[in-house]
Amino acid sequence: MSNKLKTFTNGIIKENPVLVLVLGTCPTIATSTSVLNALGMGLAATFVLLGSNIVISLLRNIIPNKVRIPCFIVVIAGFVSVVQLLLQAYVQSLYQSLGIFLPLIVVNCIILGRAEAYASKNKVLPSALDGVVMGLGFTFALVLMGFFRELLGAGTILSGYVNGVNGIAVPFFHSNPMVMMILPAGGFLMMGFILAAIQKIMARKED
């Protein structure tokens, strides 16, 4: 149990793929313009991580070493296709909002990295846990950035992309939006602020 708890805390906090390892910067910046956008991308990536880790772990003794990366990509692409079809069928607005970054999950360095570094070398249950934890860590980072970028850039929380969800307007920020925060430049700035804050907190804990 302690090992599972350690794996969970590592994926969410100590080894967060975005906030500590600084992986997946491109989709993080592009899809964290709002909370719901970020949540959708994070959950999609988590589903792909879980499914691909399980399948790759099951096939780890069958896949030839020389062609392992192409095989990993084929497996990951299968799960990404499932996600695309589901979103296109049931959450069309989110599907359109994520755009090209949804199919680009196939070559996301976080997912390929976990397939190569962990799933291909470990049993199914640990690989599944690793996929869930890393996916939740990615989702946490996206939602955190999405919250601040949406709040500062649009003055709302939980707006758009889901039918019946109109969002909550925060009066001061809604009247004085910092539009740059929902642009790519604002994404880089917000990511820098959050990374700096996390490094500061971690340095204090070490001291």
Region annotations inferred by a language model:
Residues 23-29, 45-46, 50, 77-84, ...:
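Hydrophobic core segments of alpha-helical transmembrane domains in multi-pass membrane transport
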Residues 35-51, 71, 95-106:
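Structural signature of hydrophobic alpha-helical transmembrane segments
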Residues 51-65, 112-122, 197-199:
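C-terminal ends of transmembrane helices
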Residues 63-76, 97-103, 127-130:
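Cytoplasmic-side transmembrane-helix entry/capping segments in multi-pass membrane proteins
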Residues 82-97:
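Transmembrane alpha-helix boundary signature
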Residues 158-181:
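Short, membrane-exposed interhelical loops at transmembrane-helix boundaries
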